[in-house]
């Protein structure tokens, strides 16, 4: 059975929802899934004053454990068209894994959340994939295998590179039912392709 990690960073809970949906989809695809988050770097008093969702139940991951999984889906909030610094800080600690080649041929996929529709989602998806490619990981994007993203009948996130959602600047917009379904599809797709590669 495929072992998958869904690893995320979420300040306000948007990516937490997307990560949970991706994990559900991966389980539907036959994977054994672990859901974890990266450590918060913002001081607790600042996070509380900024109304961060600090009661997230997912345990904190450690960089060394990434090698334990066949596939890793990363979900991250974005900052100025890049992954959030919390995720970048976590990934920057994987140099030892890189030196050992511990993630070579593991499967990787990415999802992001932005404040605005044009907040750099595609750039954040691709730049996060770069991190995975430096490790020799095999990227499985959402892609146009997910035909639902071809429609223009409703505003929704998504790109061929990975699933996205928009939170609005104040965090008031929550992931839509369609976006959560899209994340489930991405999780299921990654699980099924990983099973073919590592089964």
From Swiss-Prot:
Nucleotide-binding as UniProt keyword: yes
Domain named Flavodoxin-like is located at 4-190
Under InterPro entries, the record lists:
Flavodoxin/NO_synth, Flavoprotein-like_sf, Flavoprotein_WrbA-like, FMN_Rdtase-like_dom, NQO
| Superkingdom of the organism of origin | Bacteria
List residues binding substrate: 98
Q: Where is the composition biased (Polar residues)?
A: 163-177
Q: Which residues bind NAD(+)?
A: 12
Q: What Pfam families would the database entry show?
A: FMN_red (PF03358)
- Quote the catalytic activity from the record: a quinone + NADH + H(+) = a quinol + NAD(+); a quinone + NADPH + H(+) = a quinol + NADP(+)
Which EC number(s) does the record attach to this protein?
A: 1.6.5.2
Matching entries from PROSITE patterns are given as:
FLAVODOXIN_LIKE
GO annotations of cellular component type: membrane
Query: What UniProt keywords are attached to this protein's entry?
Result: Flavoprotein, FMN, NAD, NADP, Nucleotide-binding, Oxidoreductase
Q: Which GO terms describe its molecular function?
A: flavin adenine dinucleotide binding; FMN binding; NAD binding; NADH:ubiquinone reductase (non-electrogenic) activity; NADP binding; NADPH dehydrogenase (quinone) activity
Is Oxidoreductase one of the keywords? yes
Per the record, the coiled-coil ranges are: none
The cofactor binding remark recorded in the entry reads:
Binds 1 FMN per monomer.
Q: Give cofactor(s), names only.
A: FMN
Q: Which family does it belong to?
A: Belongs to the WrbA family.
Q: What HAMAP family does the record tag this protein with?
A: NQOR
The protein in question is named NAD(P)H dehydrogenase (quinone)
Q: Which organism is it from?
A: Brucella ovis (strain ATCC 25840 / 63/290 / NCTC 10512)
């Amino acid at each position: 059975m495929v072992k998958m990690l869904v690893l995320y960073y979420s300040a306000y809970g948007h990516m937490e929802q997307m990560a949970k949906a991706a994990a559900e989809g991966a389980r539907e695809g036959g994977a054994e899934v672990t859901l974890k988050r990266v450590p918060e770097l913002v001081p607790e008093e600042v996070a509380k004053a900024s109304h961060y969702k600090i009661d997230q139940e997912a345990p904190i991951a450690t960089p060394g454990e990434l090698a334990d999984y066949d596939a890793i889906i990363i979900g991250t909030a974005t900052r100025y068209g890049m992954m959030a610094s919390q995720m970048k800080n976590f990934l920057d600690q994987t140099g030892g894994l890189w030196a050992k080649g511990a993630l070579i041929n593991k499967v990787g996929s990415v999802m992001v959340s932005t404040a605005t529709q044009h907040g750099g989602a595609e750039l954040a998806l691709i730049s996060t994939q770069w991190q995975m490619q430096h490790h020799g990981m095999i990227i499985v994007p959402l892609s146009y295998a997910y035909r639902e993203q071809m429609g223009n009948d409703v505003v929704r996130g998504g790109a061929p590179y990975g699933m996205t959602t928009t939170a609005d600047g104040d965090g008031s917009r929550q992931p839509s039912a369609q976006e959560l379904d899209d994340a489930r599809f991405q999780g299921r797709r990654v699980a099924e392709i990983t099973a073919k590669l590592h089964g």
